[in-house]
Amino acid sequence: VSHPTEPPRLKRALGLTGLTLFGVTYMTVITVFTTYGIVNQVTDGHLPAAYTLAVVAMLFTAASYAAMVRRYPVAGSAYTYTQQSFGGAAGFLTGWVMLLDYLFIPMINFMLIGIYLNTQFPAIPVWVFTLVALLLVLLFNILGITLVNKLNIAIIGLSVLLVVVFVALAFKTAFGGDTAVSLIEPFTFGEGGIGAIASGAAILALSFLGFDAVSTLSEEAKNPRKDIPRAIILSTLTGGLLFILVSWAGGLAFQPEWSSLSAGEIEAAGVTVMDVLGGEAFTAFFVAVYVVGAFGSGMTGQVSVSRILYAMGRDGMLPRPLAKLGRRFGTPIVAAVTVSVFALSALFLSLEAVAFMISFGALAAFAMVNLSVIRTYLFPKGGRRQPITVRAFLAYGVAPLIGFALTIWLWTSLQPATWLVGAIWLAIGVVIIAIVTGGFKRPVPKMDFSEGEPSTEQIDALGEEYPLLGDRA
């Protein structure tokens, strides 16, 4: 007998192919143009080589995420896995570093909106577009407005179309002239050597954010325990190969002297390569699609981090005013304004600096997931009940250790300034732990990362099913 009060159950309709496609679209192929100029300058035009290294490193990490999903077949995150494997303090610090990522993600979207719109309307400064985007997202967040899901689907569809046309134009340009083109050269280390390629690959970690989003579909998968781990690995591989293809095609067709370009030219390189290959109309189409997508991503990131700050304020881990809700709309207005004030840094930071900071947090979280596999499977709490098999040792010991080593290698390839900011942020996290635990005498409270990096649909559902509770200002 069905009761009207029972919540509707999600239909288990997604197989391996559907889950993989979700993961690839969540990563967004057009992301390759976010750091197109930055990484090409760092690697002296060897972006495909950097992507290849990044894909190899990410496949090991994806395998670790897949292993953790098998153990915890629910939507999880690096914070969840670290907290379960190593306890509250390690989990909190991992979550704290992830929070740094969440704070910078809206910022980089605002910056890109300003940079790209300025290429079409050069009379208006970059900072004006950036500030307007920031204020609009803040307003929408306070009012509780989110983008319609159909618009997100349209942006994804247009992005895929754009990339397909771009690759076709790039190959036509590369092979349509009389100049001989080297197919292999973009995959070599170049004069900068493996160090430059590693630095580029470290920045590209931000291209893979969200590859684990497949884990949120556990209730909609036909065979979640089997298919979701596979889909995580397949979506990482497929998305990575698409990144390599796009960067390779662009590198064959457009080879400027990257070291001689100005900072502004480097940041807007994605627009420049579109203009060279497709002309003004194609470039305008690219900018329109990219800006709308960046605006949606900025909104999603803003809502996500505002709710995390709200929860931390509510639980006493951060100042209580962060838990204040707007009287009329019930949204975390103080937290939203705090995120926007932080995002004002976009007016004077470089795109490269922000990209490095996002990669710092991402790589730190990835490293902890790799360690969590080793701890969970080889050294479980309460001890092992049976001997370790060779297969288990290779899958849950050697593979995640390689993933950890590769991640740390890329992590150490980031700029020194990035490490300084990251170290200060971690130190603040340790101080917070000391305060909320009364000098490490009480257990470390859990952070509310239940939503991870939610999609717009998830945010809509969150607002309907789990309205925020708290003091209304």
Regions found by a protein language model. Give the residues of each.
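Membrane-interface "cap" regions at the ends of multi-pass membrane proteins
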Residues: 1-37, 41-46, 58-63, 75, ...
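Helix-loop-helix junctions that connect adjacent transmembrane segments
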Residues: 5-10, 44-48, 52, 125, ...
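Extracellular loop-to-transmembrane helix junctions
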Residues: 11, 24, 32-129, 238, ...
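C-terminal membrane-solvent junction of multi-pass transporters and transport-like membrane proteins
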Residues: 17, 151, 321-330, 366-419, ...
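Membrane-helix boundary/coupling elements in multi-pass transport proteins
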Residues: 74, 97-110, 203, 208, ...
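TM-loop-TM module centered on a large, flexible mid-protein loop between adjacent transmembrane helices
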Residues: 80-81, 87, 118-119, 231-299, ...
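Membrane-interface loop-to-helix entry segments
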Residues: 114, 126-180, 232-237, 355-368, ...
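A generic transmembrane alpha-helix motif of multi-pass inner-membrane proteins
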Residues: 361-362, 394-473
